[in-house]
Amino acid sequence: MDLIQDIIRRAKANPQHIVFPEGTEERTLKAADRLLAEGVVRLTLIGDPSAIRSHAQELGLHNIDKANLLDPKNHEKKQAYIDLLLDLRRKKGLTEEQAAVLVEDPLYLGCLMIKAGDADGELAGAINATGDVLRPALQIVKTTPGISCVSGIFMMFLPNNTYGENGLLLFADCAVMPNPTAEELAQIAVSSAESARAIANVEPRIAMLSFSTKGSAKHELVDKVVEATRIAKEMAPELQLDGELQLDAALVSKVASLKAPDSPVAGKANVLIFPTLEAGNIGYKLVQRLAGAEAVGPVLQGMAAPVNDLSRGASVDDIYKMAAITANQSIALKAKKG
């Protein structure tokens, strides 16, 4: 778990402005207090400022006033955000009256702050469903140019450090896209490469997984992975990426030497792209429960700016870590833009 400490160190070295739309929620407040005390990020907490301060006092938190406390119903940029939302959504039939209501929704307000350049990223989901977090993000922040789908990646820290990157594997998509097309699967692979560099600080070696290795089985499901591999290589020819590969061929060098001897990643993959959400979700939970791996995520990828969705069962520590991860995504995005 030294990687988590490295993620926190990088965040502290270049503090990013992260928005917490659920600013009055207890776990969120506790995580915010720790983040502010340690200087990991700069924060905006959305909610009634008096309610935030009162709750923080009840919880014995002493750093919340270091955050920007933003009342969604009354702040100096409200009209500017209404105008921005109208510019973005007028063609979809949004009226000024509707926009005025939406900008008071903390999830919309957080995304508008990002779009306006007033914040670098958002973290929500402790008390909101994934769909409610993603909807304003897709409408306002939108996806990365050249990427049409959002996906979710997990960092899996295995007790056995012979796999992946000293025991670190990245799994995608385990959270968002139920049955991606070949093109969407390729986009997930390219987005995952960006995440590997931005969050894990590793050079990705990507395996496109299937139940077949290099033509060992014939099926339309295999064809999808083969096509996704071709598209991903066209999108990002510099990537170390190969498919289709079975899991053992992707991770075990002895198996790789037999099944895919000419593959640039077989036997040493550190990023695993699953063909469906069903496979990815089951896969990460199997490794978590049966192999004793620690799963950190999902981290959303494919957005034009970082917006992350928490599990509603997230702990204070989960929120703390995800805020630092969100900051790392922002740092990497800014570096890429120059």
Regions found by a protein language model. Give the residues of each.
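Anion-binding alpha/beta catalytic cores of soluble intermediary-metabolism enzymes, centered on
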Residues: 1-266, 271-338
